[in-house]
Amino acid sequence: MTNLKLTTIFVLFFCINIIGFIDRHLLSAFGSQIVAELDLTRQQFGLLTGFAFVAVYALSGPVMGVLADRHNPAKVVTVGVLVWSLMTAISGRATSFFTMLAPRMLVGVGEATLHPSATSIFTKWSGVGSRSTIFSLFFLGGHVGVGLAYWLAGTFGDTLGWRQLFLLLGSVGLLFCIPLWLFVAPLVARSNQTNDKPLVSRPSVTQIVSDLRHLLVSSTRFRIAVLGFALVHVLYATNQFMQLWLSSERGLADYEAASVYGAVYLTVAIPAGLLGGLMADLFIRYFRTTKYLFLVIVLLASGPLLIALRYATIDTPLFQIGLVASVFMITFPYGAMFAAVIEEVPARIQASGTGFILFACNVLVIGGVTWGVGALSDYFQTTGLTQPLSRALSIGDAMTLLAIPCFWWLHRHQTQMMQITQPANDAMTDSNSEQK
């Protein structure tokens, strides 16, 4: 496999990842318009942007992973892109909550094929030393996609409207099926036939489930790490309401709200996503400490700005800084956070551990909290409270900050373990030196 072909395949998957995240967040970017046109409650909107998509996406992920392992992963993702692109186009014809709900759920099924299939292909065709870079760049496409969703809604929503953009996005997705099926799938098939990178023997499904269950029961560190990781993902859920919040309670025009948030997201997320992992590694090496302390410092520095955002008026610097913090807080520490949590999982079941972690974040947190914020906002509105969405989002922000004590406990525990093991390691080093 030549470097040119590998680069072409990577760029193709990178672009598909961008398309997937645009599709995932375009509904949120047009929140106020879709809520008004389809006569949705905020609870229903929270279901569409959260649980309806996320639950199906997370539950389908393990199944798609098995299919990608047993069959040609390029063909699996081609079918997935075909399904989600068609459903995206159909979403543009929705006339009610239920006619939007069904295609959004099927979009989740289709998009669940991408990451397992891409992981299968990239792992087989890349060396260990380059995988971190490859996956960091690949997941960067998600940040680009989120920002582009809001930018597209703000820039072209007024002229094209949300229905036409959904149809256009679905059409673009369908075009990617052609090179996937005709170019990537044959290359994957030939690579498997020549056994350039033979598969390693894997434990049985029963053994994997048993090991994962044992990890959950026996490892307090793993449970707290997953809890902290999941709590930070509450910010993903609250950010689903950003366009709706900016337009309904901060006075921005619908398309201006989407455009402003899209511009901020792109400006902050790309450099933050690229530099966060590098800064974490430098911090750990320089201070000889843990990743968890880095996470605590980042969350402590940006958390108060997030809380202040909900109460700042739109013409103040505090509002602008808070808006930046809402993006920075999830994108800058994400690489270090994921690496820290996955290090709590034994190497033999890291793929299954990753699946469980993402399931917990997507279904229990992003899906559940998105629905909860919408329902709470509706309740506050019925009681006559002012700024009901701001109040509901503030509760979500407070939940995000509960990750800080989780990461602090993990830092203290890991530091104590290092202090216990370091003298033993030093003694062993001295003994080896004397023998020499």
Regions found by a protein language model. Give the residues of each.
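Juxtamembrane intracellular "pre-TM" segments in multi-pass secondary transporters
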Residues: 2, 188-224, 249
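Extracytoplasmic gate region of multi-pass secondary transporters
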Residues: 28, 220-269, 273-274, 334, ...
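Extracellular/periplasmic helix-loop-helix junction of adjacent transmembrane segments
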Residues: 30-59
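Helix-breaking motifs and short loop linkers at transmembrane-helix boundaries and internal kinks
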Residues: 39, 72, 93-99, 127, ...
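Conserved MFS/SLC helix-loop-helix module at the cytosolic interface between two early adjacent transmembrane helices
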Residues: 59-95
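Cytoplasmic membrane-interface "Motif A"-like loop-to-helix N-cap segments
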Residues: 70-80, 282-298
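Cytoplasmic helix-loop-helix junction between adjacent transmembrane helices
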Residues: 103-142
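Helix-loop-helix hairpin linking two adjacent transmembrane segments in secondary transporters
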Residues: 138-188
